[in-house]
Amino acid sequence: MPHSWDYDAVVIGSGPGGEGAAMGLVKQGARVAVIERYHNVGGGCTHWGTIPSKALRHAVSRIIEFNHNPLYSDHSRLLRSSFADILNHADNVINQQTRMRQGFYERNHCEILQGNAHFIDEHTLALECHDGTVETLTAEKFVIACGSRPYHPNDVDFSHPRIYDSDSILSLHHEPRHVIIYGAGVIGCEYASIFRGMDVKVDLINTRDRLLAFLDQEMSDSLSYHFWNSGVVIRHNEEYEKIEGCDDGVIMHLKSGKKLKADCLLYANGRTGNTDSLALENIGLETDSRGQLKVNSMYQTALPHVYAVGDVIGYPSLASAAYDQGRIAAQALVKGEATAHLIEDIPTGIYTIPEISSVGKTEQQLTAMKVPYEVGRAQFKHLARAQIVGMNVGTLKILFHRETKEILGIHCFGERAAEIIHIGQAIMEQKGGGNTIEYFVNTTFNYPTMAEAYRVAALNGLNRLF
């Protein structure tokens, strides 16, 4: 006789991974509950990560545009805005996103349970509700999509009012004139752009020898130059020895002997999976040192009926990929296998000012692989559309095989890079000879557009062949 479960599946977390899994499951007729520890759905992506930081970036970039465009300003008076002012814009976007995503669950009759969950056994969860009561619920299968949080080393006092992580920085209530950002990964670089755009002095501490080393070096160098040109001080190959919180700021002692003082510190060096409260030891699952779970190609953990998606499984730790992982896991959970899979070349969008976006191989990778490739480039300053809107800083680079003309990688630096990249990605994904740089020469683009950069870059690259 089949077992009677409360639900066919329970999804822990309502971020992109949890939402993708939940929507995929209910569309296939499963009885699903989603557990969310906070009062609103959306997870860290909506409330502390992707959405608010990109909303902040947009507001700051518009201020920069106003102050530098003679159409709006004669430079005699600069537009300034407080951090609290631009946070209001982020709050409005968060509220819109929350209402929209809440509607997804309601329309699809997917139950939302609020509280903190942990495993009692392999098919039972305890749910600690916000009113203090504890409920138990059973399910045949589970999807862990509880996301991640900023990594907190034990020797940094995050309770100090001038020491922030990438979550708490959204509660900044004073106006810093100088900020230290420790960690020059994606989050650190994005916030360096935001603060410098607000005319705040920025010391960016990088524990490696160059910014965002996973990028094509030309893109990384472009960002480094742009930071230097805007006044960001980058300190490479540095690690902190000690961090002191003071009444009026923070002092950072570096292992190299240097000392830095600023009004506040943003610690942005790594993230940890939110698995420590799930009591995974009760079901025999283990995580790595960063709280992340190992999964197979169908996102199953060591327990076949327990799946995991999103930041909690590590790379690529992208909201876009997490949603697809959830959708694929839902298909595998219901049907026993998944016909869908993540694409091999996942685009990366980095929302610095200007943006950076990449898909496919870098020049360094192709050189190491001994692939005979050529490069086609288009400078934004030569495009009519860029001249019209004042977006002269930027470049599009296409890497393609010299013999087959197959596109191997696309890299873009400049405003709207994260949008522009998808044109090339669509061609890269074509099968049966459809992936060719000659497409951009043989098609007709609207004029004037930023998309025209592809035709310019394609012609530039093809003209290099002999």
Curated annotation (Swiss-Prot):
Task: Respond yes or no to whether keyword Nucleotide-binding is given for this record.
Answer: no
MF (Gene Ontology): dihydrolipoyl dehydrogenase (NADH) activity; flavin adenine dinucleotide binding; NAD(P)+ transhydrogenase (Si-specific) activity
> Its GO biological process terms?
2-oxoglutarate metabolic process; NADP metabolic process
Keyword list (alphabetical) reads: Cytoplasm, FAD, Flavoprotein, NAD, NADP, Oxidoreductase
> What is the E.C. number?
1.6.1.1
One GO CC term, this protein:
cytosol
- Compartments reported by the entry: Cytoplasm
Instruction: Write down how the cofactor binds this protein.
Output: Binds 1 FAD per subunit.
Gene3D superfamilies of this UniProt entry? 3.30.390.30, FAD/NAD(P)-binding domain (3.50.50.60)
Q: Which InterPro entries match?
A: Class-I_Pyr_Nuc-Dis_Oxidored, FAD/NAD-bd_sf, FAD/NAD-binding_dom, FAD/NAD-linked_Rdtase_dimer_sf, Pyr_nuc-diS_OxRdtase, Pyr_nucl-diS_OxRdtase_dimer, STH_gammaproteobact
Q: Which reaction does it catalyse?
A: NAD(+) + NADPH = NADH + NADP(+)
Q: Which cofactor does it need?
A: FAD
The primary site where this protein sits is: cytoplasm
Q: Which Pfam families match?
A: Pyr_redox_2, Pyr_redox_dim
Q: Which SUPFAM superfamilies match?
A: FAD/NAD(P)-binding domain, FAD/NAD-linked reductases, dimerisation (C-terminal) domain
Binding of FAD, residues: 36-45
In terms of superkingdom, the source organism counts as: Bacteria
Which purpose does this protein serve, as stated in its record? Conversion of NADPH, generated by peripheral catabolic pathways, to NADH, which can enter the respiratory chain for energy generation.
- Give the family, as the similarity comment puts it: Belongs to the class-I pyridine nucleotide-disulfide oxidoreductase family.
Protein name per the record: Soluble pyridine nucleotide transhydrogenase
Gene label = sthA
